[in-house]
Amino acid sequence: MRCLNMIMAEPPGLITICLLGYLLGADCTVFLDHEDATKVLSRPKRYNSGKLEEFVQGNLERECMEEKCSFEEAREVFENTEKTTEFWKQYVDGDQCESNPCLNGGICKDDINSYECWCQTGFEGKNCELDVTCNIKNGRCKQFCKLDADNKVVCSCTTGYQLAEDQKSCEPAVPFPCGRVSVPHISTTHTRAETLFLNMDYENSTTDYENSAEAEKNVDNVTQPLNDLTRIVGGKTAKPGQFPWQVLLKGKIDAFCGGSIINEKWVVTAAHCINPDVEITVVAGEHNTEETEHTEQKRNVIRTILHHSYNASVNKYSHDIALLELDEPLTLNSYVTPICVADREYTNTFLKFGYGYVSGWGKVFNKGRPATILQYLKVPLVDRATCLRSTKFTIYNNMFCAGFHEGGKDSCQGDSGGPHVTEVEGINFLTGIISWGEECAMKGKYGIYTKVSRYVNWIKEKTKLT
């Protein structure tokens, strides 16, 4: 301050001398000591709020907080690509997981302009919103699905198959497992199980017709259809071995019905086909009834079991199912193979897939002559309401309709007792038995089938089928 007073009072020459002294650190005290200077230059450290705080270290504040940095600059701070990437996802566009978008216990992982949910077992989807237990997509199992004690999906297979390495698919465990077409020249895959399961409402599919109010009809309300042995008009000619579970039932003179191989000793057919006075011969491996093809196997029936609820005097087509025991076991091969029988729930589910295959040597057109070569037809399932409206006859809840409204295609006389099968991932399951109908292939009329799902427990009990 003394120097400043001198500058104001003295002439210019003295001012020059005073300024020189100032620059040389003379008596003018204008510089602060070290401690005071440090206080002036210091500033409070920034606080980094939010999830980014855990990433801030080293020179990150200078590199990326005070000004926008590049990924490479951030990498220099972390010296670790994984940590840098995790920081970068939040740094660029904020935390996408802040709103907790993942459902059902899913864990959210932030990404640039997006996020990823790591779902708990049994759930999937963008936000883990989809239940992938057995109720949806069948747990991705190709055949059967159930939940274990921890509510985790466990897949399983029908008899003669085992789980493949993926624990979802099924592969043969025996040379000639049920429901499998093994003749090399025949393509077997008409449908894919995954597609079918994906397109189904599985929970609703297990609801049987018996829950329908329209199905509650008294079994004593007896009305008989027009055709006694009704049940392939407009079908295609099968190749040898294409339906190896199909059998032909013959009396002493003529063939009269069809059937399906359950195992080496048992065949299932329609109860109305059985006449106690007629000895039945079962022909397996048959294709052309007018030629010997050396694939045929003939067996005599030694015991017939009609379903205990079947009563032809009350109604000839209610509980229309019977089992035939053979005198000797069939020899299984590519032309003689049993059909698969699932449990009640899955048999009903497979039926609801919508399409099935029927086969037989019945009449190839209404009032025509029987076929000599095995015929087959793909038929759509008809909803129950439409089925009931199509006929004046009683349709019980142990029956279902299949066929075409426009007519021209149907099972027909002589096909009775034959199989209605549904293919699931190349494996065929019995879902119906050809039973009856009004004429054959008439417009607005459908084929009526015995619903096998109602009888699978009985079939397995009587035939010892596991």
From Swiss-Prot:
Keywords: Blood coagulation, Calcium, Cleavage on pair of basic residues, Disulfide bond, EGF-like domain, Gamma-carboxyglutamic acid, Glycoprotein, Hemostasis, Hydrolase, Hydroxylation, Magnesium, Metal-binding, Phosphoprotein, Protease, Repeat, Secreted, Serine protease, Signal, Sulfation, Zymogen. Its main location: secreted. One of its GO terms (biological process) is blood coagulation. InterPro entries: Coagulation_fac-like_Gla_dom, EGF-like_Ca-bd_dom, EGF-like_dom, EGF-type_Asp/Asn_hydroxyl_site, EGF_Ca-bd_CS, GLA-like_dom_SF, GLA_domain, Pept_S1A_FX. Disulfide bonds join 64-69, 97-108, 102-117, 119-128, 134-145, 141-155, 157-170, 178-340, 257-273, 387-401, 412-440. The modification Sulfotyrosine is found at residue 202. Residues 93-129, 130-171 form the EGF-like domain. Residues 1-25 form the signal peptide. Ca(2+) 8 binds at residues 286, 288, 291, 293, 296. Mg(2+) 2 binds at residues 72, 76. Residues 47-92 form the Gla domain. Mg(2+) 1 binds at residues 61, 66. Belongs to the peptidase S1 family. Calcium binds to the gamma-carboxyglutamic acid (Gla) residues in the Gla domain. Calcium can also bind, with stronger affinity, to another site beyond the Gla domain. Under physiological ion concentrations, Ca(2+) is displaced by Mg(2+) from some of the gammaglutamate residues in the N-terminal Gla domain. This leads to a subtle conformation change that may affect the interaction with its binding protein. This is Coagulation factor IX.
